[in-house]
């Protein structure tokens, strides 16, 4: 039986920390669905299509990965619909745990067959967050050690377009 998991997030943008968690998840699961979820509480720099495109480019040579978009609905229901028994979440710091723990309990209530698996990234990514990457890139800082080259190019392009307006 194939072990399936979903790895949800806004991934705005997808960082090397996200990639590290994905690679760790693939040592446990046969297939991981990266699920881009829209978050109404966050304003996105990149469109869903741009984020999907970048993640697909980054994971093109990685077997066992599928990039999907959740258009509304509950994550626990989506997990059930694809046959996933786990939701993968990355934890960088202790402060991430409280929120993620609440979500895991809710998802478990909504779908008792799904378990949340918390994975810690390599220590060199524990302070890397998409919001920090966006801000540093906006201010002209070098984020090349924290994102894939395609993400770096898209960040530069996006901020050049914004500055031209």
From Swiss-Prot:
It comes from Chlorobium phaeobacteroides (strain BS1). InterPro entries: Cyt_trans-like (IPR004821), PPAT (IPR001980), Rossmann-like_a/b/a_fold (IPR014729). Pathway: Cofactor biosynthesis; coenzyme A biosynthesis; CoA from (R)-pantothenate: step 4/5. This is Phosphopantetheine adenylyltransferase. GO terms for cellular component: cytoplasm. Keywords: ATP-binding, Coenzyme A biosynthesis, Cytoplasm, Magnesium, Nucleotide-binding, Nucleotidyltransferase, Transferase. It catalyses: (R)-4'-phosphopantetheine + ATP + H(+) = 3'-dephospho-CoA + diphosphate. Homohexamer. Its EC number is 2.7.7.3. The keyword Nucleotidyltransferase applies. Reversibly transfers an adenylyl group from ATP to 4'-phosphopantetheine, yielding dephospho-CoA (dPCoA) and pyrophosphate.
């Amino acid at each position: 039986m194939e072990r399936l998991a979903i790895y949800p997030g806004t991934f705005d943008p997808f960082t090397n920390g996200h990639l590290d968690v994905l690679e760790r998840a693939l040592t446990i699961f046969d297939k991981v669905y990266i699920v881009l979820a829209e978050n109404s509480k966050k304003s996105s720099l990149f469109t869903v299509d741009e984020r999907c495109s970048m993640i697909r480019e980054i994971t093109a040579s990685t077997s066992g990965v599928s990039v999907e978009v959740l258009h509304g609905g509950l994550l626990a229901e989506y997990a059930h619909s694809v046959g996933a028994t786990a939701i993968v979440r990355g934890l960088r710091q202790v402060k991430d745990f409280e929120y993620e723990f609440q979500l895991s309990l809710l998802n478990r209530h909504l779908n008792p067959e799904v378990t949340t698996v918390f994975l810690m990234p390599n220590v060199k990514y524990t302070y890397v967050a998409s919001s920090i990457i966006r801000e540093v890139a906006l201010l002209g800082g070098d984020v090349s050690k924290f994102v894939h080259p395609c993400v770096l190019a898209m960040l530069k392009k996006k901020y050049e377009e914004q500055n031209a307006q």
